[in-house]
């Protein structure tokens, strides 16, 4: 079972919140106190909440659910992509385009355009174009890949989103809320836990903390997928007998 320990969280600096003057009073239940003008997250609250969230991610993956990892701030961007790829899930790590979930129909058309351009770049179509046309299409493809590359194979809305930084990704959270998609989020002391189904109180800026959250989440998803695949194989064997 994918879990994190208190020691791992301390080593990663999960307990370091923001300066006290930037705090959100709604995070009071999760704050241990302050040190040198910085709020300290109560890891005794975070630990069970995080492990509960991991268990739920495993359950969703076990039911063949799709998880969308969201983290567009610089400190999270590359790690978000790596974690999603590692557990064969989906990600948005550059910029959240308004309507990415709530206007999925339009997003799907943009994904189709991206895939068409990818095909054209590989089947020789680009070579038949003028230099300018080929360059324009290459630029369009690169732009679409940056925005939609992590969700181009998602084929429909996700079953949950895992967010690094509730405050920073509030638009993504609002869209998920509107559609009834469960939200898992790292919530720092300057953010609001409102509208987050699985609150994980902790530092959302430190690279080591972000890496810890994502590694654990990816492990939980892989565990669920492995169990689901084992069940599928068992059914296939029984059907073949």
UniProtKB/Swiss-Prot annotation:
What's any one GO cellular component for it?
cytosolic small ribosomal subunit
Supply one GO molecular-function term. Answer: structural constituent of ribosome
Q: Which GO terms describe its biological process?
A: translation
Q: What HAMAP family does the record point to?
A: Ribosomal_uS2_B
Q: Which family does it belong to?
A: Belongs to the universal ribosomal protein uS2 family.
Q: Which NCBIfam families match?
A: rpsB_bact
Protein name stated in the entry: Small ribosomal subunit protein uS2
The record lists the organism as Actinobacillus succinogenes (strain ATCC 55618 / DSM 22257 / CCUG 43843 / 130Z)
Q: Which gene specifies this protein's sequence?
A: rpsB
């Amino acid at each position: 079972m994918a879990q994190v320990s208190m020691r791992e969280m301390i080593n990663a600096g999960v307990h370091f919140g923001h300066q006290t003057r930037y705090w959100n009073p709604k995070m009071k239940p999760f704050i241990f106190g302050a040190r040198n003008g910085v709020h300290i997250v109560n890891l005794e609250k975070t630990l069970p909440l995080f492990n509960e969230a991991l268990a739920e991610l495993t359950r969703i993956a076990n039911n063949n659910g799709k998880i969308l990892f969201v983290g567009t701030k610089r400190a999270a961007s590359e790690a978000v992509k790596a974690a999603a790829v590692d557990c064969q899930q989906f990600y948005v790590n550059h910029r959240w385009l308004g309507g990415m979930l709530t206007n999925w129909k339009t997003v799907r058309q943009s994904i189709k355009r991206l895939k068409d351009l990818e095909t054209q770049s590989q089947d020789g179509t680009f070579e038949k174009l003028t230099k300018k046309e080929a360059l324009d299409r290459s630029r369009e493809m690169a732009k679409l890949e940056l925005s939609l590359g992590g969700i181009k194979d998602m084929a429909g809305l996700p079953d949950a989103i895992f967010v690094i930084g509730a405050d920073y990704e509030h638009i993504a959270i609002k869209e998920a809320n509107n559609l009834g998609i469960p939200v898992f989020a790292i919530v720092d002391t300057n953010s609001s836990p409102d509208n987050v189904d699985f609150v994980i109180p902790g530092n959302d800026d430190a690279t080591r903390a972000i890496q810890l959250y994502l590694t654990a989440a990816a492990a939980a998803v892989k565990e669920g997928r492995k169990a689901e695949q084992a069940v599928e194989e068992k059914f296939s064997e029984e059907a073949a007998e």
